UniProtKB/Swiss-Prot annotation:
Cytoplasm listed as a keyword: yes
Protein name: Malonate decarboxylase acyl carrier protein
Origin species: Klebsiella pneumoniae
Cellular component annotations (GO), alphabetically ordered: cytoplasm
GO molecular function, one term: acyl carrier activity
Modified residues (O-(phosphoribosyl dephospho-coenzyme A)serine): S25
HAMAP family documented for this protein: Malonate_deCO2ase_dsu (MF_00710)
Cellular compartments annotated: Cytoplasm
Gene (name only): mdcC
InterPro entries: Mal_deCO2ase/Cit_lyase_ACP, Malonate_deCO2ase_dsu
Statement: the UniProt record of this protein carries the keyword Phosphoprotein: yes
Pfam families according to UniProt: ACP
Length: 99
């Protein structure tokens, strides 16, 4: 298992908490907690070794498209494809936006 920590400047604020996916589903779960800060801190535990560049590229793309919210994001990944990872991350941000 690889542990990855990333930090990004936040360009928007959300409130509350959100969860998307289930660890037992075989792909990934994402937990988001809003914070009054200027950054999004991301902690990833993944079964895929040497994947930091992939995660960095995914978050860079998300940041360009919609901006990233302030808070804490915890990801438990068990080999999800980049498409599934993006969907799960966007789901927690959408849920928190409507909390």
């Amino acid at each position: 298992m690889e542990q990855i920590t990333l930090s990004f400047p936040a360009s928007r604020a959300l409130s509350g908490r959100a969860l998307a996916g289930v660890v037992g589903s075989g792909d990934m779960e994402v937990l988001y907690t809003a914070a009054q800060s200027a950054t999004l801190n991301v902690q990833i535990t993944t079964s895929v070794d040497n994947s930091q560049a992939r995660w960095q590229a995914l978050f860079d793309r998300l940041n360009l498209i919609n901006g990233l919210p302030a808070g804490q994001l915890i990801i438990h990944d068990f080999g999800a494809t980049p498409g599934v990872a993006r969907i799960r991350i966007e789901q927690v941000f959408e849920e928190a936006a409507h909390a």
